[in-house]
């Protein structure tokens, strides 16, 4: 919800996931330069959504490749696997940059390299929608609604389940590699 990201560089981890997929579109709509990660076979799909650069998340020189795209470091990062990327993030951030942390499912208790973040003044903005004040949530809904009504946001739906198949839907949510959200039809 930063006031303006136009012209800023944004790193979005996991661009092919449900969060990354939407983050790419919203950041592009707001005028950002987008660097994202995914499997190589997803490159064209993510470029079609608005990513300027798609990098292989398994590349052991990922931090260097990000810095080739943003030599001074990225202004903003959207991180869906914080624990997995905790050591790389300060390497790719510009001083006083912001990391919006949405998740860390693979490593909920990572060892935090405090000094690396401290000496760059990196701000961590941990996002948990359920805890957002209603006024902040309303602003976010307005941004999403604006992008959607201006044909700049195309949610990806992997599959739809009936309410009786709620357990199957949950199993599908937990599977890696899906392409979009899982919906329950009520």
Predicted regions and their residues:
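Local beta-strand N-terminus motif with an aromatic residue
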Residues: 7, 51, 72-75, 153
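N-terminal Rossmann-like NAD(P) cofactor-binding module of classical short-chain dehydrogenase/reductase
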Residues: 55, 75-78, 100
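Mid-domain Rossmann-like dinucleotide-binding core that forms the NAD(H)/NADP(H) cofactor-binding site
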Residues: 1-59
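C-terminal hydrophobic helical "lid"/dimerization subdomain
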Residues: 135-186
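NAD(P)H cofactor-binding loop motif with strongest signal on the N-terminal glycine-rich segment
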Residues: 14-15, 81, 104
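Short amphipathic alpha-helix with an adjacent loop that forms part of the alpha/beta core around
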Residues: 61-72
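Glycine-rich phosphate-binding loop and adjacent beta-alpha segment
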Residues: 84-152, 186
């Amino acid at each position: 919800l930063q006031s303006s990201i136009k012209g800023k560089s944004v790193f979005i981890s996991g661009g092919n996931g449900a969060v990354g997929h939407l983050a790419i579109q919203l950041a592009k709509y707001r005028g950002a330069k987008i660097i994202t990660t995914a499997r190589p076979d997803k490159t064209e799909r993510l470029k079609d959504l608005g990513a300027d650069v798609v990098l292989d998340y398994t590349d052991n020189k990922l931090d260097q490749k990000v810095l080739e795209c943003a030599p001074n470091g990225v202004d903003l990062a959207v991180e869906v696997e914080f624990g997995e990327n905790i050591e790389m993030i300060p390497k790719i951030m510009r001083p006083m940059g912001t990391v919006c942390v949405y998740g860390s499912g693979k490593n909920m208790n990572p060892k935090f390299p405090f000094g690396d973040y401290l000496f760059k003044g990196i701000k961590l903005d941990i996002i948990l929608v359920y805890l957002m004040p209603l006024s902040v949530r309303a602003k976010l809904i307005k941004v999403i609604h604006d992008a959607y009504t201006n044909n700049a946001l195309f949610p990806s739906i992997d599959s739809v389940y009936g309410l009786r198949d709620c357990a199957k839907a949950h199993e599908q949510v937990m599977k890696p590699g899906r392409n979009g959200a899982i919906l329950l039809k009520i």
